[in-house]
Structure formats: C-alpha cells, structure tokens
C-alpha cells in the first residue's frame, strides 16, 4: 500500500511547491521593484524628519500646511495592481520617491523663507523699540528708562546670535512688549500733568488739596517705577478716576478746569485740520461743548461735559496719529527740498546741481516711511513712525548747521556733540556719518577716536538719515542686486569683506574695493581715479562705502551695541 501511494504524495508535493513558487512570482511581479519601494520610504522618512525640524525651529504650521496636505494625499495613495507586470508599480514608487524629494526641497525653501521673514520683522521691531527708547531718553521725564535700556541690550544680544524663526519671533515679542510700554509713557505723563494742573487750580481757588497732592506724589512714584504696559494702563485708569473726583470736590474751580479741558480739545481739532484730516464732526462738537460749559451751573453739568470732551479726545487719538504720520513725511520732504535747492551741490563733472539733502526726500527716507505706513495699523505702529519722523527733522537741522562748519572732517564737530546729547549717546560707541561732508567720525563715550572719508548713496538711492542700531554683521558676504540686468542700478554678485547692516532692507556700512576715491562729492557723478566709471563713478545704492582697510578697522572695533548715526 505504501508503495502504491508514494508517487501520489510526491506529485502533490510537487504541485504545491509549484503553486507556492508561482504565487511568490505573481506577488513579486505585482509589487514593483524593491529598490524603488525602499527609496520612496526613505524619502518619506527624510521629509517627515525635516517637517519635524521645521516645526521645532518655529516655522508656523500655516506655512507648512500645503506640504502637509500634499504628503497626506501621497500617503493615502496606493500602487496599481496588475498581473504579471511590475512596471506600473515600479513607476508609482519612482514617482512617489520623486514627489517626496520635491516636497523635501520645498520645506527647505520654506524654512529659509520663514527665517528671512522673521529676521526682517525682528529687525523692524527692534528699530521701533530703539526709536521709542530714544524718544523717552530725550524727554528726560521718566526715571525708570534704565530698565528698558537693559531690555534693549538683552534683545540686541539675542539678535546677534539668533538663527531660527523661533529666535526671531521671541525677539519681536520682547521688542513689541517693551515698545508698547514705552508708547504709554507719554500719554500717562500728560494725564499726570493734567491732574497736577487741576490740583493747582483748586489750590489757587483756596481749596484744600492736601489729599490730592498726596495722590499725585504717589502717582508719580508709580509712574517712575512702571515697566509693563499694564502698569501704565492701571495708572491711567486711576488718574482718570482721581480727575473726576477732583471735579466733584472743586465747585469753585470747575469753570477753570472745564476751560482747560476745552482748550486741550481745541488744540487737537486744530491739529487734525493741519494734518489734512476731516475735523468737521469734532468742530461741531467743540461748538456744542463751548455752549454747554457756559450754561453749566452744577457739578453734574460740568462732569457731563467733561466726560463728553474726554470721550472725543480719546476717539480722535488714533486719527491724530495717522494724520500726523502721513503729514510729516511730506513736510520733511518739503523742508529738505527747500533747503537743498537753496544750498545745492554743483557737480563740475556733469554740470548739474544736486540735493545734499536727498536722504530726507520722498525717494530717500520718505520711501521707507511710506512703506512702514503701508503695514501700519495700530496706534503703537503710527507712533513709531512719528518718532522716526521727528528724529529726521532734528537730523535735517543738524545737516543744515554742519554744512557751513569749516571744521576739518577729522576733528570734533559741534553738530556731532548735539547729536550725542539729543539722543543720549554720550556713553555709547557711535559711527557718526555726515552726508554733507561724506565723512565718518567714530566716538567712544563722547570722545573722537577715528575719522574716515566715505561715499554714501547717490541721489536716486541715498543713504538713510537717522540713528540706527546694528541689525546684522557679516564677514565675508556676497551682495546680489535686486534690480534686473540693464537697469542703471544693477550690479553683478559682489564679494564684500566687511558688512554691518544699519537699516533693514539691505543698507550696510561696508568696504568697496572697486572704488579709489571717497569724500565730498563722491555721492554724485564723478570721475573715479581708479578708472571704474560703471560702478565707482557715482554714489552707492544707499550703503555707506569705505576703503577696505578702514572698513576692516571699523568692523574689528565695533559690535552689536554700536550705534550708527547718519545726518
């Protein structure tokens, strides 16, 4: 019996083995090439790793979402099923590997773009922080300014070592927080003065103001110890309440207090008109308030009118800032052109007259102020622009005063000292750049330590006047033109040995090895003795050019805390 069944068993085993081999061949044929499957899997892993890295360095999910969506779609796809032909499946995995690789490259670009965007934003926010800090230093009525100076130095240090979006986001957050607090100092100080004036009027009316004077003293202590926006907001609320209480307690002085409030409102209405804003509604309110105050005979009457006036003053605050910010840009341009045309530079090279004040005109700092206004929405943003504009007006006065100063470029200038005093820079390191002289003087703690001739921006793209902080330092670097080939402003990729960014948007203090000549007049068309008329025969594109060895000295003797003052 065993001999009879043995051939059948062998036949069955052979058939089973054949089926297994055939099935394996079939599965292999339908699954695609193993190498392409592995490559697709590896590329997906690489993409996932890079996405996690992007999230880890602070790239917002919103910027990564298109890639995440595409990856999800790829993950939910599957290889085609075909009999006895693995080429379609192989093609599928090859395409999958390619798409994952493309998405990886896209994520790398997103990381780079996000880093650049947040770096620029941090530089802009730090510039606004510095402007607000300078304004309050100049006002000299807030004794706790040192706390904000320390915070600025700390943020500046963070900016010097920042690498990732999350670093720049944190710097922007700190800068905005401090700027918001600084922007509340002036309104709070005005409220304090109003309260003090009210107490003074009550005292003049022979009223007992002992308690109110004690309140004012306590308020001043709170004011000078404030460090956060909430500190100033709470003090402002308290002052409003104290002012209302003062009105209740001062029936004899109410007519004087009401008149003072009305005068404040009148001044703001006049400012709206000056700025070209529609003040018709507020003008009507003013007339009604004047009539109401004349008729007022009780505390409640005065309180009601005062409350309405204060409501209007509050409501027009943002409108005033917006109007002033837009008005001052044109006003600066007008002032710069008026003086510049009366004191033009006559260029013997081409026989034309040029503005020495081009940096203050609309193509100069005006372009950048208008650009800032283009993304300005909050009161704090408008205030930052106004701070910068007021600085520009002062700097323009310094240029005008320095124009007729016969002092040699390598000696201390009176206008330099005024700049140091006005901006409280006596204990700082300052690169003081005179556009009228085309000279740079370096001051350390108020003392002149070095002087160099420079070349600043041409009339079409002047250097930007103002007091700036260091926003980046690079050695070496390569500059690439944003203008198309054929443009008079285009230049080929250029190696730079030493570069210090003084204003976001690509404004540097740097070496210009292609130039031979520097100093007065080199910001206008001229014959450069080095023979390069294409790139050396005119001013820069807004940068401050220096001889290479001098730029090396400046780079080596400065740091992230150095101030660049251009006037």
What are these regions (language model features)?
Residues 366-431, 442:
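Long amphipathic alpha-helical scaffold segments
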Residues 10-22:
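Sec-dependent N-terminal signal peptides
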Residues 40, 64, 93, 115, ...:
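Solvent-exposed, acidic/flexible segments
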Residues 408-526:
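Gly/Pro-biased beta-strand-loop elements
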